[in-house]
Amino acid sequence: GGAGVGAISAEQQDAGSAKGTPVTGSLLIGGLTPCNVIPDEILTDHPKRFRAMLVECANPAHSLADSARMRDALASLDLLVVIDVALSETARLAHYVLPVASQFEKAEATFFNFEFPDNYFHLRRPLMPALPGLFSEAELHCRLLEALGELPAEPIAALRAAWKEGRQA
């Protein structure tokens, strides 16, 4: 463990002038913890260490620079939940795996903003229905938040009704 590249000082953290990770003080990138710092954020003996993770459609146990250390870190978590279409190396370490519909069974969207000033938004309809009991990631998130009592039912019911009604393209 310890302060890594891009770490911020305790004074900066205390002053609130820079946002860093709770254990190593590594700078957040776009508000996110840098992937290669996560093992230290989990394995370091620190009161604010990461104890649980939700991994969505990613395989950090296999795809990062020191995957053996990441596997050790993930295995040491009190709770690891993986949302994925595949039973990846990370999913095999999880306490819970929440399967989701594949890219062919759900609507997906991509926003291309690298062609400024002409930006493009691509929406693709599902090619086939999802298997029973499988949802898109968005639907799964919504159901998790509802189950936790963190999502008011009223706006979601209206959105679901509009979604079911649909409209002609």
Where are the regions that the model predicts?
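Non-catalytic alpha/beta scaffold blocks inside enzyme catalytic domains
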Residues: 1, 10-168
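Long, K/E/R/D-enriched contiguous segments that form extended
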Residues: 6-8
